Amino acid sequence: MTKWKKLSHTIYQCKYHMFGIKELLSDETADKVWEVTNKHLKRKEMLPQSILKKIGAKIIFTTDDPADDLVYHKMANNIEGITFLPTFRPDAYCNLFDDNWKSNVEKICQLTGQNITLKGLVEALRMRHSYFAERGAKASDHGLLEPYGLKISQKRAEEIFQQAYNEGEKFSFRSIEIKEFISYMMHKFCEMNQEKGMVTQIHYGALRNANEYLFKNWGTDVGGDISADSVNIIENLQPLLSRFFSGENSNQSHLILYPMNQIFAHTNLMLERAFPNVHSGFPWWHNDSPYMMEQYLLHTAGSSLLASSGGPVCDGRKILSEGSRFEVFDRIICKTVGKLVSSGQMTYSGGVKAVKALMYENQVRIFNLEGESAIN
């Protein structure tokens, strides 16, 4: 149980809220914590559906591969009072640096009956995008090192596809070819989202698998990811923003930018001011603690309009975290706005409006959820 040793030094160990456990998780208490939590998890009220109903979940977005048949969403939507909606996540078909990229392209082209070409890949993804939209999808989600959006010609994109697929050339994740290819695909995805009235979400700034030893020996998602310290935002995004989120197109679709690190949040807030349908989302890893949530809200209030923020996403892989993360966020909103009101920096009515917008109204408006039966 030595893997729990470091956890004894962490703060925010809130196991007692769910399981009544007051001891810190450590080498000495790990076995007891394991036994007690498993005992609690066997109770009927700790079943997934019971937890979701207890926390008042109405609509839950999942993140799904475009090739997913979404059969479990249909089954889950038989749960009274909760709607599960898929989210289109096409990273696997854009990341030329990934060892599985070629097989992923073959999979989705075969699934949709398309030729294995750039044109075939785009059409295959368009077909699956429509499939998702027909089943209630409200957004696409894209995990990028940088928010790529350069204007790239089809000819250039085809050259890169040819190099990667037919010639087997390997590109590093920071290569110009990666930037150009993903930029081309992001324009295609924004086209699709605009046609279907879906939101484009970009999570950027995560440097994956920085610890090569961990990656080679244990694979991905084992603690070797870090925050990138250099991200080009404006130069990369400006062509995409000008095409889809300005002028006559400014009210047709929404873009939410979630930076990995709060150091990039100020740029997002400036973009939010310049482009009406671009929203600054919470820096997701940076804001997993109450302290950093409060700092970000104050930064937003001082740099942009607090009430227009895109708010946080849970990004939780565990059902028990769904309610707790949003409860912490809601409490921090009330605490932060309350301080602004009590110090005379906001009116009481303005504070109430900001809290309602951040907790609920912005999500309903941006993701076009007014017609969903679960919230009516």
Which ranges hold each PLM region?
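Metal-cofactor-binding active-site regions of metalloenzymes
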Residues: M1-K196, E248-S253, L257-Q262, L269-N376
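Histidine-centered active-site/metal-ligand motif
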Residues: H142, H203, P239
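Histidine-centered catalytic micro-motifs
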Residues: V199-R208
